[in-house]
Amino acid sequence: MVGIDLGTTHTVVAYADLKTLAASPLPPGEGSEARAAPSPAIHLFPIEQLIAPGAVAARPLLPSVRYHLAEGELAPGDVQLPWSFADPGEVANAVLGELARERGARVPGRLVASAKSWLSHAGVDRTAPILPWGAAEEISKVSPIAASASYLACIKAAWNRRFPRQPLERQEVVLTVPASFDEAARTLTVEAARLAGLPQLRLLEEPQAACYDWLHRHHGEITTALGESRLLLVCDVGGGTTDLTLIQIEPGESEPRLTRIGVGEHLMLGGDNMDLTLARTVESRLGGNRLNAGELSQLLQQCRSAKERLLAEDAPERAPVTVLGGGARLIGGARSAELGRDDVLSLLVDGFLPQVGPGEIPQSRRAAVVEFGLPYAADPAISRHLAAFLAQHAEVSRRALGERALPGCPPMPDAVLLNGGVFHGAA
């Protein structure tokens, strides 16, 4: 069995030998008991990719980005892969993964990012070549569905090179999607997999996948770990979306019984929004004219890298961010600014995770904030969206909690599972 987390920012692959799989817990939502069955060994699959011109190496994560090279930008040997790769987007000069991310942070207007968010955007033709968004006419374009397919095709090629006798298209493949993806977005995800040469797969909602992971890590001690908890909140904040799920916990014959009782609406709010906030802050410090779409995309990649450095252990106090010009202005048109660690903590914690009361609701505006054509949530405060979600599901939550619900108080989950890269920073 092969599990693929096709993320907005990164893609990761894990696998287990089904021959050692005696049994496994059924997904929450099917009224299943989290049975303590013998667990197979789970392995991460290091994904070979270009990490620099002419250099291929295996990495635990594949950045979910692609870069469309200009003619003559790199020599053919610099982008040669150790396998045959046919781009589903039919762009002859595309590179994927770490090298794509590195080039996109240096050259504006050629990076395709957040394809997963575009798959869920009903306001555009997701089969049309529209990415990179706002790029110049002479730059090759790709559709959101083809971009997503290209990451899966890259994984398939790397897998088949390592396991030629167990090709990926013949394995049991599970692909994760946000719980809030509608039927159209799920259908497009399946179509992207088909374009990548993976016609047979199952979709698994990301909060359920997080529960699977938790159950696996607490194998044999699930009852003890959950204690007397009766209501589990899964808060999954990824690169492009925030998924909120409520799961009722009931005593079972041998292990607790987990049933999904609430799913939040599709919320385009995650790490991308945080990077955009940082980019807009840096843009205001650069001086000069407002950045165009290509320059802002370049700045986003630099801010994402700076954010990760500034929130890591032993982080520096400040990190430089530079926006290069295009064409003949590549060096002469460069503009630089700095981001401080305190800047990042203040903008992200106070802006996206402020302390709020249980009665607060998201601030409504006329429409969602549109950047790069994507309809981001108008209110960036995840905690306010969480408060509204819990208020919406107050009745079922109170029933799930039973006598553990406090009289006269809003019902609150007594167990929380946090998932997503946002919660992994050392800060």
Please report, for each region that a protein language model flagged, where it lies by residue.
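Conserved phosphate-binding catalytic cores of ATP/NTP-utilizing and phosphoryl-transfer enzymes
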Residues: 203-235, 394, 401-404
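Extended, hydrophobic alpha-helical segments in both membrane/secreted and soluble proteins
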Residues: 185, 189, 193, 207-210, ...
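Phosphate-binding loop and its immediate beta->loop->alpha context
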Residues: 27-194, 205, 276-319, 330-368
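Short beta-alpha connecting loops at secondary-structure transitions
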Residues: 258-269, 286-291, 370
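Glycine-rich phosphate-binding loops at beta-strand->alpha-helix junctions
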Residues: 173-188, 324-330, 336, 374-381, ...
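Gly/Thr-rich phosphate-binding beta-strand-loop-beta motif of the actin/hexokinase/Hsp70
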Residues: 1-22, 219-260
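Flexible phosphate/Mg2+-sensing switch loops adjacent to catalytic phosphate-binding sites
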Residues: 19-28, 36-61, 217, 224-228, ...
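Conserved phosphate-binding/catalytic loops in two-lobed NTP-binding clefts
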Residues: 196-209, 375
